[in-house]
């Protein structure tokens, strides 16, 4: 079953995100630390008439890494070529992409951690010295061809920075950690989206949506669409605080931005394991989810919000989890 709070793209969201995409850093809401650093590095590169150093953007899904890549290219005034790690299946695919670059272009590789190692190794000399050596022919007739490349900027995006090899990670001169958004920034994003799509919304409703969006613009915009639908059918089309509360209750999204799966995780820990510690594998089996799904999709937000702690012996539900789900604290094992 698809979760309304899933960070990954759903349905027509890729098209919608392109419509909403800001063009320049001054239009980009949130991620101030990353923006401020990039602003300096971009201006310095332009003053020297050089390509920007290679950039690695990392963080959870839905926080604007792809958007930031397009913004960087716009700020530099260059073209952006886009691909993804899984799409580059062999070294020849990457060679064709690199050979097509113009001087100063940006090459954006999403999910860069999923590139095959043979492909990754081709990138090393391309990133460091702007050349590649490729083998032409086969057997006794094969020969190495040295191919010079124009200076370019590689922007890699990943949700799993720890999966990058050390040689690849070391070749990125600039790193940007994309963090969960603050409520004020998300509120502004919701109101901007409402304005672009001509939705009538009151500020209190935008604020409530922001609070329940798990710090993620993609989720905020998705919830906004569903609340708009509810307001059109159950009200007069205006997205009010009352309409927002009722719609999100229908969608099982509570005031902390937790849905039924998040609550199931916490209830399992509390009811079956006295709050923990419980191993991730055991927990995954009990809620009928894959271990990687729990670790990548559910756990980060629960930890960030203080509902779960990681310990050497397993995961532990915090007092905040007990209070949120209205369990008496005297049932918690010390």
Curated annotation (Swiss-Prot):
NCBIfam families: PRK00080.1, ruvB. Belongs to the RuvB family. Keywords: ATP-binding, Cytoplasm, DNA damage, DNA recombination, DNA repair, DNA-binding, Hydrolase, Nucleotide-binding. It is found in: Cytoplasm. It catalyses: ATP + H2O = ADP + phosphate + H(+). Has 3 domains, the large (RuvB-L) and small ATPase (RuvB-S) domains and the C-terminal head (RuvB-H) domain. The head domain binds DNA, while the ATPase domains jointly bind ATP, ADP or are empty depending on the state of the subunit in the translocation cycle. During a single DNA translocation step the structure of each domain remains the same, but their relative positions change. One of its GO terms (biological process) is DNA repair. Residues 182-252 are annotated as: Small ATPAse domain (RuvB-S). Its EC number is 3.6.4.-. The RuvA-RuvB-RuvC complex processes Holliday junction (HJ) DNA during genetic recombination and DNA repair, while the RuvA-RuvB complex plays an important role in the rescue of blocked DNA replication forks via replication fork reversal (RFR). RuvA specifically binds to HJ cruciform DNA, conferring on it an open structure. The RuvB hexamer acts as an ATP-dependent pump, pulling dsDNA into and through the RuvAB complex. RuvB forms 2 homohexamers on either side of HJ DNA bound by 1 or 2 RuvA tetramers; 4 subunits per hexamer contact DNA at a time. This is Holliday junction branch migration complex subunit RuvB. It comes from Streptococcus uberis (strain ATCC BAA-854 / 0140J).
């Amino acid at each position: 079953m698809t979760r309304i709070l899933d960070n990954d793209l759903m349905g027509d969201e890729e098209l919608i995100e392109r419509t909403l995409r800001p063009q320049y850093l001054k239009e980009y809401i949130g991620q101030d630390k990353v923006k401020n650093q990039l602003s300096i590095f971009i201006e310095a590169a332009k003053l020297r008439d050089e390509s920007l150093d290679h950039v690695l953007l990392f963080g959870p899904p839905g926080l604007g890494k792809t958007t930031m890549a397009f913004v960087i290219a716009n700020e530099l005034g260059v073209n952006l070529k886009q691909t993804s790690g899984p799409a580059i299946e062999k070294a020849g695919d990457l060679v064709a992409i690199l050979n097509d670059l113009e001087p100063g272009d940006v090459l954006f590789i999403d999910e860069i951690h999923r590139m095959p190692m043979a492909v990754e190794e081709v990138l090393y000399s391309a990133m460091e010295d702007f050349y590649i050596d490729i083998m032409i022919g086969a057997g006794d007739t094969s020969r190495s061809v040295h191919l010079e490349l124009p200076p370019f900027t590689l922007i890699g995006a990943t949700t799993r920075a720890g999966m990058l090899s050390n040689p690849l990670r070391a070749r990125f001169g600039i790193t940007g950690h994309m963090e969960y958004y603050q409520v004020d920034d998300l509120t502004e994003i919701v109101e901007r989206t409402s304005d672009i799509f001509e939705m009538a919304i009151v500020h209190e409703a935008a604020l409530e949506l922001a609070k329940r969006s798990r710090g993620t613009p993609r989720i905020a915009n998705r919830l906004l669409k569903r609340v708009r639908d509810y307001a059109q059918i159950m009200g007069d089309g205006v997205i009010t605080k009352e309409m927002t509360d009722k719609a999100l209750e229908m969608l099982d999204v509570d005031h902390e931005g937790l849905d039924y799966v998040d609550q199931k995780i916490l209830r399992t820990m509390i009811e079956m394991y006295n709050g923990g510690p419980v191993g991730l594998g055991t927990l995954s089996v009990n809620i009928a989810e894959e271990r990687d799904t729990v670790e990548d999709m559910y756990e980060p937000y629960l930890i960030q919000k203080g509902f779960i702690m990681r310990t050497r012996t397993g995961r532990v539900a915090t007092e905040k989890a007990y209070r949120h789900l209205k369990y008496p604290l005297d049932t918690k094992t010390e």
